[in-house]
Swiss-Prot record:
Species this chain originates from: Solanum tuberosum
Binding-site residues, Ca(2+): D258, D260, D262, R264, E269
Keyword Protease: no
Similarity remark: Belongs to the RBOH (TC 5.B.1.3) family.
Name of the featured protein: Respiratory burst oxidase homolog protein C
Signal peptide location: none
Domain EF-hand, first and last residues per copy: 245-280, 289-324
Residue pairs linked by disulfide bridges in the UniProt entry: none
Taxonomic lineage of the native organism: Eukaryota, Viridiplantae, Streptophyta, Embryophyta, Tracheophyta
Boundaries of every Ferric oxidoreductase domain copy: 408-565
Top-rank taxon, per record: Eukaryota
Cellular component annotations (GO), alphabetically ordered: plasma membrane
Subunit details: Monomer and homodimer.
Underlying gene: RBOHC
Amino acid sequence: MQNSENHHPHHHHHHSDTEIIGNDRASYSGPLSGPLNKRGGKKSARFNIPESTDIGTSAGAGAKSNDDAYVEITLDVREDSVAVHSVKTAGGADVEDPELALLAKGLEKKSTLGASLVRNASSRIRQVSQELKRLASLNKRPIPTGRFDRNKSAAAHALKGLKFISKTDGGAGWAAVEKRFDEITAPTTGLLPRAKFGECIGMNKESKEFAGELYDALARRRNITTDSINKAQLKEFWDQVADQSFDTRLQTFFDMVDKDADGRITEEEVREIIGLSASANRLSTIQKQSDEYAAMIMEELDPNNLGYIMIENLEMLLLQAPNQSVQRGGESRNLSQMLSQKLKHTQEPNPLVRWYKSFMYFLLDNWQRVWVLLLWIGIMAVLFTWKYIQYKQKAAYDVMGPCVCLAKGAAETIKLNMAIILLPVCRNTITWLRNKTRLGSAVPFDDNLNFHKVIAVAIALGVAIHGLAHLTCDFPKLLNASEEAYEPMIYYFGEQPESYWWFVRGVEGVTGIIMVVLMAIAFTLATPWFRRGRVSFPKPFHKLTGFNAFWYSHHLFIIVYTLLIVHGEKLYITKDWYKRSTWMYLTVPLVLYAGERLLRAFRSSIKAVKILKVAVYPGNVLALHMSKPQGYKYKSGQYMFVNCAAVSPFEWHPFSITSAPGDDHLSVHIRTLGDWTRQLKTVFSEVCQPPPNGKSGLLRADYLQGENNPNFPRVLIDGPYGAPAQDYKQYEVVLLVGLGIGATPMISIVKDIVNNMKAMDEEENSLENGNGMSNAAQNASPNMAQKRGKSSSASGGNSFNTRRAYFYWVTREQGSFDWFKGIMNEAAEMDHKGVIEMHNYCTSVYEEGDARSALITMLQSLHHAKSGVDIVSGTRVKSHFAKPNWRNVYKRIALNHPEAKVGVFYCGAPALTKELKQHALNFSHKTSTKFDFHKENF
């Protein structure tokens, strides 16, 4: 639609809009009211009368211009409605034609669907145009295509993104398509079969069905009835598919729906395209409910029950969701412009200055890790140097040389590291230090498992140096030493050994070799490849991978520590007991760790839990709701260990707590990823009942007071234990990111934020009424009383400071949204102040703008507007498609919260860690907003 405005300071202003549709001409003229005019105004429109109508022949005789007959319609355009003022022929006579009466009646109806588009005079005229075209289509005239230019209209920009090939599927262009055509058609004499069309144009295998429908639509328009095409025909197909114009895109989509090519879309055809789109996006729920959604579209676009809709009706539906995307796109562009200068990478010309800045940024972001590592490395260096100098002054140095110094120096570091490697896994101690002291501000407790792994590497290096120095240097020198040189060694080794075997078969040799073998087994099975089951072996060796293998192999260290003490007591060269220091290094850590294990066993036995509810969700997720032991206190973001004797009496596995501290129960959501979790799901599935007819398709079982209850397996819990996410209350603004089942700690935080906000409201109401804090508020937020009294623990982490939370949940499957549907709805309903901004991303759905998700986007907007429920997630939270643009996420938060300190908490696959952390560093360095990145570690 083309708009023209003529402004002159001394003349009355008029506004005219003209739209040319084939041979039909519609012109609008009237006073210019402008987009801000609230009074409305009258608009006149002249429309060509189809020759097939009565008025086109009777009234047109005296009103023809350029061989066309016109009818003049005067409209009263107001803020939210369009009313017909009069309908006359061009000659001025009133019209009584039945069709025009129907036209007038239709124009007087308010458009519910298009209400969001009616923003100014121009958009109101466009609405009228749509209604006129829809009613004119009752004359069953052919729909002309490609005859009008919308390149400057808002609709063109909104629908420019209706791409039929995603960025990843078809961005290579015609050259790549032509190359694939030549490869595919080499054995078929230059003809491309329908089944290979999707592959040829770059679509993946999962879109094969969609590609077939696209082929049929393109072939129908060209009257191609064969199941194969040549290169010239493929070029025509590609030109239409790759065409960015509004009309080509819309017409292609219409052709895909209108399979019988009669120019109308029936409910059956709508149902088919919904099923096709749902299948392409792996949305099984929508596919099952295609009848319901097809009926919803027909109800909205066919209010007169004609049994079909035209392309204009489809266009109106298409305009809804993409228009929102245009707004979001504009916002994104504004964000980019506002931060472009700050985020623009500028190369520092001086390499020394560049290096200094990088180094200072590194220290600023990692100073906690740096000082701990420097202290640890410094202690190892001191111990190694001390032992080296000590043995250099002994008689053994004259025989074995520097080798004995290297071996003993490495041994001293091994003793240190075998002692401190236990400290990072003393979870109760670490949790107590996090909660009760201020050490968390200086000690990176979040990196406890990473430090544990680093120490393990240092032990491996120490063992290698110690063993190789003895086996390849010290022992051969003792065997080959002369009698005179060996004489000082008789006191330590006895008579000079005659063979290498003498050293190996001794207590020192046997214990050393066994320790190395056991350590190698434990280290190997603890690597990500074995622990996560990425390595597969044939039976019966398949049990050597997975978490069970890791868990049991790690307990070999009970034997290792026993042998280490024996090994340290049977030293050849050191005879005085008080100089054998192995037991001195190990005593305190071993006692501490043993105490932790005893505490875990004792605590789990006295704090029994009762299973209240079990549910098995899509995506192989088991939800366990348990009774809350008396006095059991925890923070959102923390985790606990779970043991089920029916699966394994000895294994304990960590899981994030998904309930909030204010809830009267405990809950965990466990995804089947390994052997133990698979067996656990099997055990609990056996006691669950299949869903009754018409109910949710979930396996579930509930504990009901006084009734026959299922025989639930016995479950023990141990915890809670500290985790990075528990510190979210220290930040006024938090960004919570969960990938798949990694949303579990974030869900607890979301619930806790809602409970805290609710408690604060209740507290304010109670204070206004002169009462103390209500019991409900205390239960919802146990820490609120401390905040009110300005008292907190030494850690200062109990006060609730969070004022804004952004929650991003990214999952691959639609069924995953069922895991926390109730919690998401509760949060959306209770968050009256808009504290929590929730975003669900379903990566199985093609990105916005891809035709395979175009109809899903339309359905989503229509259904959400009518019922407030998202069709993808089944919650009040509207879902997004494909993956988030994390850079834009950080941008928006940086703009919304300048000078703020934002806590970023992530739980999920390691692949995303690097990107999120790098964005946090970049935006912290280049904007006034500081992002603190935290990752969950188990």
